[in-house]
């Protein structure tokens, strides 16, 4: 099958299509170009372009203000020196010049404030508007594609583009772009100013720029390498954490906390190693930058003095202007990397958007009613098909099939036989023409040499996920699907889908009301524009037909009840009935039922099946089913195997062929019903779920109670003290960090003093020898300061980064284990969801790193700087210092803090803008098939457009004030300088202070305020750190109480199974105030095969959870061999149990590692092979090239459902348990896989107690005892035959599933 890549050649005017490389994930790779970035601006309206133009001009103006400030400050220095040093300037003239220069500063302040506001507001709003437009275009383009396009993307990829990638793009085209223009303007203007005042001094001083650039370029590759590898290791650790949180019950059940914790810890230790590799280079970079900055001052003053004495410079101000201009260039060069990186990321983000926007869109077809009709047969002729995401694997092989109009056609067969593929082809999600795959943007490859083979390792990791894919030539797609003599490709796709009603195994409901979800079924039909009253009538009618009205009317909000995300507030049966109502309100000519009842319990299935039977009348109906009891009445049953029709006929007709596949499938699910009597009517009340059950479920979705009393939160100082005490092995490093940070902090007050001394030197004129000797001495002092500051900063950051990485790794590993050792009830709370706890396992220790690591070192430096500058300012000029401290320093502190905090938090603020539309996009993309099937594309895109429009309006309101605050914080320094200079000048005129006192105070105050404000902004966010510290300490305290070291009686087993007694159990889940058990009592004898059956919500799985001690009963006891399990050590007790759940929960790693999850690694191969033979999986494993060392991929994705389940059985048997718990272990398997798994269970049950929860009663009819649960109590118990003879609830359940009637 050929692949065409979604190139933007048409849009870019490229005449020749390039063939990109194919990545390891099968997707073509495309390299982003700057052309992608520039193309984004085509989404700008004329008003956006005008705003951009104004913003660029304003940014240039903002950038020029600082070089102009240097000129004014140089003039100040000259005039102050002339007045107080050489005394060549009269007092009145100095007073006049002082006022004039202060007015210049005030003008620069106001100009920067206004221009800063304009540029920030203009770039922010245009960025939001353009990003909104491109998100909308992407969203529309995505929903114009076929389903296979989404299939070609990794899971969650499209949602990530809308959310994270969209935010990245916005960053790169908004303020960051304005900052880029500003810094370029600053650099250019600074160069011009410096060379105008003294080209010779400029060239000499520029050596500092060259030195900084050269030194940074030397160490940066090593820093990048270390941080890149650290990020990779952290990503792998995060992958382990995510997988662990999603399979937490299985980890707890198998006592695998330590094993998973060790696996996680290996990646954390790797990340620490890489962080410590980069640490010395980060420290060296800091040291070199600060050394060169201070050294540049000494060099400039030394050489400037020489030029002044040689009359090549006419005043002191020229030296100041050149020096400050060069320092400004260094600062701009340092800061311009941030917007450059943002633009680079935005280029990649733009490419991500355009790969979908430019993707060729499928031909919609042109035929509609009356040219074609949906009431004719659908014919598949010689159809051969493979999915675009797996082009080498043939799914359908020359398939020929006729789906007759007005009749029910059921399609059955083993997994992978092509049943659901036929649905996809009829729905036109896929076609029989060559399919294309969306390309994957990749950044330009860097040099891979000397990288320790990391690239190869990463590629190998990626390839593991595709280990199961077959290779070979792509499958040649061919064949024809037609109706009314026309190919489906020629029929308008929206019209065709409007004739189809689809009900899937997992129905997707939007986070809206029941009424709106059902109403969605009318979109695209001729009733779409009917009056609201008519629509409401149709909704009610459809819900009645689907048996949904009965539970809807019992809800407090009725049809206006919100269903929650993906319908979470409704039970499975309720969701399914809403989906049926949504399908039949369309009054479709064709009804497709794809596993519509497979995930519903017996009682729910009975009701849903009745609704489906009613909906199928007089319609062309296609039914895909694993439960063959649901398709006995089909007009025609088609049996598939390996993509071909091998049998077809009625249920009765196919059963006559005892050698046929259908007979074997039925036999695998057959229930023995004993002697039948006439009139197998089912009690009427079974047609409807009990009001108690419905009410209970409804209440359970609304009312929640707190998990438990939360531990009292500790303050930041208390948490800091506790962590500080626990890290006493690192005290010596912390003490040294504190000492060197004090040395680094002393550099700023010392710099202020040296600056004043240098200014005084020029007061010795015209004594040139004195000036020369003094300038040499004080320039040497600058060099001493440069070396000292460089060493202090280097030592501070070397020690702090090393300490931080050590502390983070220690607590990250511990914290992850604390999480794993929590009770299962802990994870039921909304605040402790799987995703939240996976993220916290990395984020909370990172916050702790900020509390005790390098960022805190910056805070220490800032505090030492503040104390030092205040002390020296008060010592030299207390009056000016007090005014500055009371007025200027608070403003500078607040401005510096806010500005840097704003820059750090900008991305967070940016993300918040589109949060609602991002959620909606995520939901819509998750329902892609539902949207396509019900022709909801236009409605979805319109809703997304409305949300985006609202976000833009909200952003406009926020931007007005945020931009003003940012502009003020950015320009406040200039205003404060004007205040200090004016007041200081007045004090000089009055003779209260000399030149040295003034300049020491002036430089101290300005440097202290701005430097400290910036440094403090890098400090930890107090609220976040406090919350993270409390979570870590809180989980540790609860973990110690419940951990594996906890005391408790040792559980005693005598082999051959365990007797289980539940005595008067009362139980409700901690997060719901709805009783599950109300005095339940039952006994399972030693070595028995016991089955638990009953309606959904009857407590079957809850018994398994109680036996596993995931929860404790509120009242009553659970006894095993006469021992109360609550008194046993939970970890030793669980060693006697093994759990196999509906979700097999395999983890990344080899098959052997998964099988040995709950036991020691020292088990020999013979034992592993033996349990795999018992689980009927050994032969399959040995057929794999890597055998037991085969990687299973994330969540076992490279294995089929049946294979995963058999591996899970082998894992359970490996523990040689006394109790085997099987919770819906076969409910999602096809008949063939189920039969293999069932045989494995029956072998596994010998010599042990086996407790089985099942919906399919055929899997438990051989049980020694069957317990029928309902409404919190035991309704019936007995063997299969005994319960049939009683003709009670169990008999009714069997009637609804029987296959041989």
From Swiss-Prot:
Residue ranges of domain ABC transporter in the record: 378-667, 1060-1296
Top-level taxon: Eukaryota
Record keyword Heme present: no
Domain ABC transmembrane type-1: 54-345, 735-1024
Subcellular location, principal: membrane
Phenotype upon loss of function: Does not affect the production of beauvericin but increases the expression of BEA1 and BEA2.
PROSITE patterns referenced in this protein's UniProt entry, alphabetically: ABC_TM1F (PS50929), ABC_TRANSPORTER_1 (PS00211), ABC_TRANSPORTER_2 (PS50893)
InterPro entries: AAA+_ATPase, ABC1_TM_dom, ABC1_TM_sf, ABC_transporter-like_ATP-bd, ABC_transporter-like_CS, P-loop_NTPase, Type_1_exporter
GO BP: oligopeptide export from mitochondrion
TM ranges: 54-74, 103-123, 177-197, 203-223, 281-301, 313-333, 745-765, 779-799, 858-878, 880-900, 961-981, 987-1007
Comp. bias intervals (Basic and acidic residues): 15-30, 442-454
One GO cellular component term noted in the UniProt record for this chain: mitochondrial inner membrane
Induction / repression: Expression is highly repressed by the histone deacetylase HDA1 and the beauvericin cluster-specific repressor BEA4. BEA biosynthesis is also repressed by the activity of the H3K27 methyltransferase KMT6.
Any one Pfam family match given in the protein's UniProt record, by short name: ABC_membrane
GO molecular function: ABC-type oligopeptide transporter activity; ATP binding; ATP hydrolysis activity
Role: ABC transporter; part of the gene cluster that mediates the biosynthesis of beauvericin (BEA), a non-ribosomal cyclic hexadepsipeptide that shows antibiotic, antifungal, insecticidal, and cancer cell antiproliferative and antihaptotactic activity. Functions as a regulator of beauvericin production, rather than in BEA transport out of the cell. Beauvericin has low toxicity to the producing fungus and BEA3 does not play a role in detoxification and self-protection of the producing fungus.
Family: Belongs to the ABC transporter superfamily. ABCB family. Multidrug resistance exporter (TC 3.A.1.201) subfamily.
Protein's name in the database: ABC transporter BEA3
Organism: Gibberella fujikuroi (strain CBS 195.34 / IMI 58289 / NRRL A-6831) (Bakanae and foot rot disease fungus)
Gene: BEA3
């Amino acid at each position: 099958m050929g692949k065409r890549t979604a190139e933007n050649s048409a849009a870019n005017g490229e005449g020749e299509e390039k063939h990109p490389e194919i990545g390891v994930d099968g997707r073509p790779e495309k390299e982003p170009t700057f052309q992608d970035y520039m193309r984004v601006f085509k989404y700008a309206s004329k008003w956006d372009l005008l705003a951009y133009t104004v913003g660029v001009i304003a940014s240039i103006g903002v950038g020029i203000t600082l070089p102009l400030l240097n000129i004014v400050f140089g003039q100040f220095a000259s005039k102050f020196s002339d007045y107080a040093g050489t005394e060549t300037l009269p007092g009145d003239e100095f007073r006049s010049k002082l006022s004039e220069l202060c007015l210049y500063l005030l003008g620069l302040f106001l100009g920067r404030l206004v221009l800063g506001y304009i540029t920030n507001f203009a770039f922010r709003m245009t960025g939001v508007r353009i990003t909104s437009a491109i998100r909308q275009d992407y969203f529309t383009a995505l929903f114009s594609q076929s389903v296979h396009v989404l299939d070609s993307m990794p899971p969650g990829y499209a949602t990530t583009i809308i959310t994270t990638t969209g935010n990245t793009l916005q960053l790169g085209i908004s303020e960051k772009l304005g900052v880029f223009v500003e810094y370029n303007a600053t650099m250019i203007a600074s160069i011009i100013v410096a060379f105008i005042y003294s080209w010779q001094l400029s060239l000499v001083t520029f050596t500092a720029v060259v030195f900084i650039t050269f030194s940074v370029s030397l160490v940066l590759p090593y820093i990048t390498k270390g941080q890149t590898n650290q990020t990779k290791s952290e990503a792998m650790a995060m992958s382990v954490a995510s997988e662990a949180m999603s399979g937490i019950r299985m980890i707890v059940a198998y006592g695998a906390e330590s094993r998973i914790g060790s696996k996680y810890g290996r990646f954390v230790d790797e990340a620490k190693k890489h962080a410590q590799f980069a640490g010395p280079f980060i420290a060296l970079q800091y040291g070199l930058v600060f050394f060169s900055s201070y050294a540049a001052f000494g060099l400039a003053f030394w050489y400037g003095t020489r030029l002044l004495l040689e009359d090549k410079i006419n005043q002191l101000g020229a030296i100041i202007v050149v020096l400050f201009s060069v320092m400004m260039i260094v600062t701009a060069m340092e800061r311009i990397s941030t917007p450059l990186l943002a633009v680079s990321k935005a280029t990649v983000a733009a490419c991500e958007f355009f790969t979908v926007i430019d993707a060729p869109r499928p031909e919609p077809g042109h035929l509609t009613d009356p040219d074609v009709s949906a009431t004719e047969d659908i014919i598949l002729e010689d159809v051969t098909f493979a999915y675009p995401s797996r082009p080498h694997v043939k799914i359908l092989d020359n398939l020929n099939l006729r789906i007759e109009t007005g009749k029910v056609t059921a399609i059955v067969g083993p997994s992978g036989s092509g049943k659901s593929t036929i649905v996809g082809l009829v729905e036109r999600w896929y076609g029989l023409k060559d399919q294309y795959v969306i390309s994957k943007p990749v950044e330009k490859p860097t040099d891979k040499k000397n990288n320790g083979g990391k690239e190869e390792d990463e590629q190998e990791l990626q390839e593991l996920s595709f280990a199961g894919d077959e290779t070979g030539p792509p499958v040649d797609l061919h064949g024809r699907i037609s109706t009314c003599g026309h190919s489906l490709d020629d029929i308008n796709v929206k019209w065709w889908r409007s004739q189809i009603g689809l009900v899937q195994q997992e129905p997707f409901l939007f986070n809206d009301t029941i009424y709106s979800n059902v109403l969605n079924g009318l979109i695209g039909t001729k009733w779409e524009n009917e009056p609201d009253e008519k629509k409401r009538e149709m909704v009610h009618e459809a819900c009645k037909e689907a048996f949904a009205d009965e539970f809807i009317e019992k809800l407090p909000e009725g049809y206006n009840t919100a269903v929650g995300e993906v319908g979470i507030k409704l039970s499975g049966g309720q969701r399914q009935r809403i989906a049926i109502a949504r399908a039949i309100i369309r009054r479709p000519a064709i009804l497709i039922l794809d596993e519509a009842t497979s995930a519903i319990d017996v009682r729910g299935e009975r009701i849903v099946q009745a609704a489906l039977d009613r909906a199928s009348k007089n319609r062309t109906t296609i039914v895909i089913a694993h439960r063959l009891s649901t398709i006995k009445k089909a007009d025609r049953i088609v049996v598939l195997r390996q993509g071909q029709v091998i049998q077809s006929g009625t249920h009765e007709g196919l059963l006559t062929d005892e050698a046929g596949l259908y007979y074997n499938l039925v036999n695998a699910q057959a229930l023995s019903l004993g002697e039948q009597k006439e009139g197998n009517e089912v009690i009427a009340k079974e047609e409807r779920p009990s009001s108690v059950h419905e009410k209970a479920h409804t209440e359970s979705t609304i009312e929640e109670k707190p998990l438990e009393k939360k531990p009292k939160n500790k303050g930041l100082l208390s948490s800091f003290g506790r962590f500080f005490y626990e890290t006493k092995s690192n005290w010596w490093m912390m003490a040294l960090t504190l000492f060197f940070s004090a040395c680094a902090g002393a550099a700023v007050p010392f710099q202020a003093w040296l600056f004043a001394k240098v200014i005084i030197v020029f007061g010795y004129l015209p004594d040139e020898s004195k000036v020369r000797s003094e300038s040499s001495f004080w320039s040497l002092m600058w060099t001493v300061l440069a070396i000292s500051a460089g060493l202090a900063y280097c030592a501070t950051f070397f020690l702090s980064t090393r300490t931080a990485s050590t502390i983070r790794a220690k607590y990250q590993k511990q914290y992850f284990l604390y999480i794993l050792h929590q009770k299962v009830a802990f994870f039921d709370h909304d605040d402790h969801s799987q995703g939240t706890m996976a993220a916290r396992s990395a984020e909370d220790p990172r916050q702790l790193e900020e509390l005790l690591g390098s960022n805190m070192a910056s805070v220490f430096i800032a505090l030492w700087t503040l104390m030092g500058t205040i002390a020296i300012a008060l010592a030299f000029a207390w009056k000016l210092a007090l005014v500055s401290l009371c007025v200027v320093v608070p403003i500078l502190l607040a401005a510096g803090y806010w500005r840097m905090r704003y820059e750090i938090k900008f991305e967070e603020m940016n993300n918040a803008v589109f949060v609602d539309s991002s959620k909606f996009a995520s939901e819509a993309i998750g329902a892609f098939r539902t949207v396509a099937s019900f022709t909801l594309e236009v409605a979805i895109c319109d809703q997304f457009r409305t949300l985006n429009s609202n976000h833009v309006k909200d952003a406009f309101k926020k931007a007005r004030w945020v931009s003003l605050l940012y502009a003020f914080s950015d320009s406040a320094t200039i205003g404060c300088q004007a205040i200090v200079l004016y007041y200081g000048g007045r004090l000089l005129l009055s003779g209260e202070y000399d030149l040295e006192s003034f300049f020491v105070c002036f430089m101290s105050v300005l440097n202290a305020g701005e430097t400290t404000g910036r440094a403090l902004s890098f400090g930890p966010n107090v609220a976040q750190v406090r919350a993270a510290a409390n979570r870590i300490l809180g989980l540790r305290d609860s973990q110690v109480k419940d951990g594996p070291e906890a005391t408790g009686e040792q559980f005693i087993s005598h082999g051959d199974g365990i007797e289980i007694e539940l005595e008067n159990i009362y139980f409700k889940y901690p997060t719901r105030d709805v009783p599950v058990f109300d005095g339940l009592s039952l006994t399972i004898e030693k070595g028995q095969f016991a089955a638990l059956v009953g309606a959904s919500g009857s407590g079957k799985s809850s018994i398994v959870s109680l036996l596993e001690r995931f929860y404790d009963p509120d009242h009553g006891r659970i006894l095993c061999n006469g021992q109360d399990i609550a008194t046993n050590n939970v970890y030793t007790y669980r060693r006697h149990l093994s759990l196999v759940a509906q979700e097999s929960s395999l983890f990344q790693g080899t098959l052997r590692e998964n099988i040995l999850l709950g036991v020691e690694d020292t088990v020999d191969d013979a034992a592993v092979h033996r349990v795999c033979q018992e689980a009927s999986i050994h032969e399959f494993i040995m057929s794999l090239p890597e055998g037991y060392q085969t990687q299973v991929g994330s969540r076992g994705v490279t294995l089929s459902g049946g294979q995963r389940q058999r591996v899970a059985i082998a894992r359970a048997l490996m523990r040689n348990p006394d109790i085997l718990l099987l919770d819906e272990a076969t409910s999602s398997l096809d008949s063939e896989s189920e039969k293999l798994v069932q045989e494995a269970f029956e072998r596994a049950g010998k010599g042990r107690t086996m407790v089985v929860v099942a919906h399919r009663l055929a899997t438990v009819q051989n049980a020694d005892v069957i317990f029928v649960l309902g409404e919190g109590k035991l309704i019936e118990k007995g063997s299969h035959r005994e319960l049939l003879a009683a003709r009670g609830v169990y008999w009714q359940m069997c009637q609804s599933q029987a296959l041989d009637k």
